[in-house]
């Protein structure tokens, strides 16, 4: 009854947002065997997850999520793209130059609270430094400030290893960063990230504990702003999905379905929220159909509007978007149990 009341309130607050829930997303990982490698799982994630907490700018720009971090968790999301920047001496989460309404510390507190409530689960936090708003002094502080924030959560931060198992991670956060941080030996650093349509099969994830290194195959082609590029994005997502299907159990896959299909007046970095919605409306059904026709492991799949099947319109688009964000989260989770 409590969960029904929570979702009723959420729907009343967001009348243009439709949320579908076919299972209990709070603790779906309880059904996973402890011996399974995390690299071999199918895990739904949220691209620029903190934008669901609100942004300090007109929401027509840079907003990639409708749900809060807690609500993303509740619908089954377990990978969170968080991009902290040092402002003064504190960490705030940004998307490019756009500041969200939540600090990095508060975001970690929310995830730690969820893990305390649901100790069978684990979370993955993908990080990168969002340096657009930092000055040179703040950039120099980023590695140590992030390391201190992770160190502050103690053993809630997991020790990364290439073939780490579900049982190793329950109740913990796995930190995987695209920028090096210092002062903490938990988590891991990515090298070789690519934004090309082809992605890469030769990136690496290296543990800060013992330098053990995993191979990473990934795709993050984020600006499919015309028809040709949109087709390339579709092919890139499906190619990365195909690679995940045949990957060894200790090879990690990160597949960003996210992207924006139009820009404000043709310029970057002002990617419009409606551009992200339009991309989700096109890409998500393609992946859902692929997984329906041929179930397979997916790796970590980063989504826009995770948990929302329908969202409101935006700049130059007044009608609602069918973003299929709840259906695709359910579909990804379901691949673990085929």
Q: For each of these PLM feature ranges, what is it?
A:
Residues 84-87, 127-130, 178-180, 306:
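An acidic- and aromatic-residue-enriched active-site/binding cleft used to recognize and process polar
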Residues 152-295:
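Surface-exposed substrate-engagement region within the catalytic domains
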Residues 21-75, 88-117, 122, 183, ...:
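Long, acidic (Asp/Glu-rich), low-complexity accessory segments flanking structured domains
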């Amino acid at each position: 009854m409590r969960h029904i009341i929570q979702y009723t309130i959420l729907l009343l607050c967001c009348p243009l947002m439709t949320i579908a829930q076919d299972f209990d997303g709070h603790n779906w990982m309880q059904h996973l065997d402890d011996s399974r490698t995390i690299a071999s799982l199918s895990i739904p994630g949220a691209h620029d997850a903190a934008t669901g907490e609100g942004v300090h700018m007109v929401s027509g720009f840079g907003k990639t999520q409708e749900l809060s971090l807690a609500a993303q968790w509740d619908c089954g999301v377990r990978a969170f793209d968080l991009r902290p920047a040092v402002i003064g001496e504190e960490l705030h989460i940004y998307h490019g130059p756009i500041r969200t309404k939540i600090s990095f510390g508060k975001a970690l507190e929310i995830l730690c609270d969820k893990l305390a409530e649901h100790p069978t689960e684990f979370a993955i936090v993908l990080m990168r430094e969002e340096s657009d708003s930092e000055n040179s002094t703040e950039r120099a502080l980023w590695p140590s400030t992030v390391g201190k924030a992770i160190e502050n959560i103690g053993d809630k931060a997991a020790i990364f290893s290439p073939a780490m198992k579900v049982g190793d991670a329950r109740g913990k956060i796995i930190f995987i960063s695209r920028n090096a941080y210092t002062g903490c030996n938990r988590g891991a650093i990515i090298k070789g990230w690519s934004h090309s349509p082809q992605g890469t099969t030769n990136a690496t994830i290296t543990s800060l504990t013992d330098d053990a290194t995993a191979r990473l195959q990934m795709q993050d082609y984020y600006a499919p702003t015309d028809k040709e590029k949109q087709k390339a994005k579709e092919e890139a997502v499906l190619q990365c999905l195909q690679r995940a299907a045949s990957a060894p159990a200790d090879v990690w896959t990160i597949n960003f379905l996210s992207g924006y299909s139009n820009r404000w007046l043709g310029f970057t970095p002002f990617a419009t929220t409606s551009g992200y919605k339009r991309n989700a409306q096109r890409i998500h059904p393609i992946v859902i159909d692929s997984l329906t026709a041929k179930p397979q492991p997916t790796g970590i799949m980063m989504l826009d509007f995770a948990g929302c099947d329908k969202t409101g319109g935006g700049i130059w688009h007044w009608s609602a978007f069918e973003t299929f964000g709840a259906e695709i989260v359910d579909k990804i989770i379901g691949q673990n149990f085929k």
